[in-house]
Each structure stands twice: as C-alpha cells, then as structure tokens.
C-alpha cells in the first residue's frame, strides 16, 4: 500500500500583486517628486549664490573707487553731464604728488583708474554692469544678471529702507541733490533670479529679485553731517 504526501505551494494572488505594484509606483512617484524638488531648490540656491557673489564683488569695486573720487581736484570729482540715476562717471588725479610720474600725469587725468564710468549695458537680453576706463582696459564687465542699478546722490548721510524683493530703496531720510553737489552716494542693485522649472511642476522656483545696497562717503568732500 503506497501513500502520497500532499504538498501545497503558496504564492501571491493577482490582486495582491496589483496592490504591491500600485504601492511601489506610488513610492517611486513620491521619491521622484522629492528628488525633483530638491534638485530645483539646489539649482536656485546655486544661481542665487553665483549672482549675489558677482553683484557684491562689483559693488565692492565701485564703492572703493567712488569713495576716492575728486582726489586732488576741485569739486567732488563727479562728471555731472555724464552721471545720473543709471550711470556714474568719476574722475581723480591719483598721480598729482607722485614724483616718479611725468609732468603730464601729475597735471592731467590721463592715467589708468583716473576717469571711470559705471553703467548698465544691455546685450542679448541680458543686463551687464560695466566699468569703462578710457585710459586703461576700456570696458570691463563687473557683473551680469543685473536687473536694475539706481544711483542716489545726497549732501549728507541718510537712512533708508531696502525692501526685500523690490528694485530700489524707499523711505529715504533726506532729499536727493544733483550729482555735482553730492557728498554721499547710495548704490542699489537689483539682481533677478530666473525661474527654475515650469509653473505647477514639482519644486518650481518662481523668479525672484534680491536688492543689494552700498553707502559711499566721498572722502574728498567736506561731509560735515556724517
């Protein structure tokens, strides 16, 4: 007499497999969404760091050179006819007392860094903050991705508000003056960050503007109210 051992094999039913696949796909979708968000946030932060570092470096260069305007000259050194809210031209005689310089260099403004103009140059739908030195290297790009630059002229130190996300300062404590009468300058530069992704997509970063400001005292003027 023979006997048979009955073996039962267990497994997943079709319904269980479908449920497992749905859960797996949901987890993969959530993971890909989080990854897309993280990548776009990182892209925006990298863009912000590069743009702000570029603009801050440009502001530092401008502030240092503007502070020395009018050195060994009558007046504040600002060329009023070539200066305004969006551009600034400054002059200084840096070699006036340099015994090693030529007579022409001591008596005239003909050397590098003595006649400088700052302005916004638009090219290929991009705004560049440029520095022009006719006696030096000509035109140099100080920063790109600049949305707006505004230069304010005052005859005394001022206070103001720099609203986040705006393009210029507000609530200034004193009235502006003409460039030739300025003793104190406020430079405001708006840096626009481009959008990352498409509206409605995971991790979308909308366009955003960051306002950077610098206060410059013209050292070669009598800023009695400073």
Question: What is the predicted role of each segment?
Answer:
Residues 45, 74, 202-203:
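Short, surface-exposed loop/turn segments at secondary-structure junctions
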């Amino acid at each position: 007499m023979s006997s048979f051992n009955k073996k039962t094999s267990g497994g997943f039913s079709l319904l269980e497999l479908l449920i497992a696949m749905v859960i797996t796909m949901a987890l993969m979708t959530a993971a890909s969404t989080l990854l897309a968000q993280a990548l776009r946030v990182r892209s925006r932060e990298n863009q912000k760091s590069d743009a702000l570092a570029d603009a801050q470096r440009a502001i530092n260069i401008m502030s240092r050179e503007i502070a020395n305007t009018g050195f060994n000259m009558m007046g504040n050194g600002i060329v009023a006819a070539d200066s305004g809210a969006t551009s600034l031209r400054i002059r200084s005689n840096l070699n006036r007392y340099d015994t090693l310089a030529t007579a022409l260099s001591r008596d005239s403004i003909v050397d590098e860094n003595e006649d400088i103009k700052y302005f916004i140059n638009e090219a290929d739908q991009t705004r560049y903050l440029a520095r022009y030195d006719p006696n030096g290297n000509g035109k140099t790009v100080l920063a790109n991705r600049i949305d707006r630059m505004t230069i304010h002229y005052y005859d005394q130190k001022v206070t103001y508000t720099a609203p986040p996300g705006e393009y210029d300062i507000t609530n200034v404590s004193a009235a502006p003056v003409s460039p030739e009468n300025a003793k104190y300058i406020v430079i405001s530069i708006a840096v626009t960050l481009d959008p990352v992704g498409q509206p409605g997509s995971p991790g979308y970063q909308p366009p955003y503007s960051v306002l950077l400001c610098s206060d410059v005292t013209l050292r070669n003027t009598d800023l009695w109210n400073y």
